[in-house]
Swiss-Prot record:
GO terms for molecular function: DNA binding; transposase activity. This is Transposase for insertion sequence element IS1533. PANTHER family: PUTATIVE TRANSPOSASE FOR IS117-RELATED, TRANSPOSASE FOR INSERTION SEQUENCE ELEMENT IS1111A. One of its GO terms (biological process) is DNA transposition. Required for the transposition of the insertion element. NCBIfam families: transpos_IS110. It comes from Leptospira borgpetersenii.
Length: 346
């Protein structure tokens, strides 16, 4: 019986393109396509186990999620789930087919040029992450419906007073008192307005549920530590925990930049030219937005507000010191990035 076989998989909704090779042979042993269901996968793995002792599989993370990964693990197969940004790509590699992708993954896995596999969440953490992403989608839908409502009013030449801000108590009073002589226009306005109100209530309910999850185990301690930092509350802390999932590989801020692509475009171009690799920002857009919004709170120097002091009560002194150090550093960075104003000559 032979020892090792390396299997590259290009996974789709209905099918899986497979290519596998051994450590001794440079040629692909076999290529085939199977249906994406447990019966066909189990049959394929059982056939491989009759010929090889060790089976190493890998596939690229995508919209199919983690069920295939968990199922292969349950069959006793060593499976690696790869993040798309971790796969090395050549500038000359312009042709992309299922067959070529499967062969490339198998060869990369055999030569161990794929690095570490992406950290995947357990089913409970994945459920919380999906709930957070659903909340983010609701936030975007609410913003779109608010725009539709205001554009509808603008088309009818109904404008808000310049002194009144949008979506405040006075704005809602103004909307409640709006009436149209045309019955169809009134129904249209009611439809737009009711969507906004319903989604606002749903958003508040989801925020309340997220806070309850954050205050329960196993998130309570980690959320409490993250809330010591300015700009981080329950929602931001839960997004960080669920999107990053594992903070152990993170050694410094540069790793976070590479993971979330929060660096500037100039640094990105310099890094791309140095490594001669093409990167696309397609992994964690929500994490980039959350980190940017949190960092934006450090425009002003920290004055030790009552809210931050209450969050830090009961937390380790080392965490509080690091949070204060980070706040001062980010504020200093913001001040250095500001354009220098020339003094006016008298």
């Amino acid at each position: 019986m032979k020892r090792k076989v390396y299997v590259g998989m290009d996974v789709h909704k209905e099918t899986i393109q497979i290519a596998y090779l051994t450590s001794n042979s440079k040629e692909i042993l076999k290529e085939q396509q199977i249906k994406h269901n447990e019966v066909q996968i189990k049959k394929f793995i059982k056939k491989l186990k009759l010929e090889w002792n060790e089976i190493h599989c890998c596939y690229e993370a995508g919209v199919t999620g983690y069920p295939l990964y968990r199922y292969l693990k349950s069959l006793g197969v060593n499976c690696i789930l790869l993040a798309p940004g971790k796969i090395p790509r050549q500038n000359t590699d312009k042709i992309k087919t299922d067959k070529r992708d499967a062969i490339k993954l198998a060869r990369l896995m055999r030569s161990w040029r794929i690095g570490i596999d992406s950290c995947f969440p357990v089913e409970e953490d994945e459920a919380v992450r999906d709930y957070l992403r659903s909340r983010d989608s609701l936030r975007l839908d609410l913003g779109r419906n608010r725009q539709r409502l205001m554009k509808f009013l603008l088309r009818k030449d109904i404008k808000l007073l310049p002194t009144t801000k949008y979506w405040t108590v006075s704005h809602y009073k103004w909307l409640n008192n709006l009436h149209f002589n045309n019955e169809i226009l009134q129904e249209t306005f009611n439809d737009y307005y009711s969507r906004v109100r319903v989604q606002e209530e749903n958003l508040k309910a989801m925020d309340k549920k997220i806070q309850e999850i954050a205050e329960s185990e196993p998130y309570r301690e980690k959320v409490g530590i993250l809330r010591c930092f300015r700009g981080v509350d329950y929602l931001t802390a839960m997004f960080l925990l669920c999107e990053v999932n594992d903070f152990k590989p993170i050694q410094n801020g540069r790793f976070v930049h590479e993971f979330s692509w929060t660096c500037s475009w100039r640094i990105f171009q310099r890094f791309q030219k140095k490594t001669n690799r093409d990167y696309v920002k397609l992994e964690v857009p929500r994490l980039r937005r959350i980190l940017t919004e949190a960092a934006w709170q450090h425009r002003f120097p920290g004055t030790g507000s009552k809210i931050i002091t209450a969050r830090r009560s009961g937390q380790p002194a080392l965490v509080v010191a690091l949070a204060e150090k980070a706040s001062l550093r980010l504020h200093k960075k913001f001040r250095n990035l500001q354009p220098k104003r020339k003094k006016l000559l008298k």
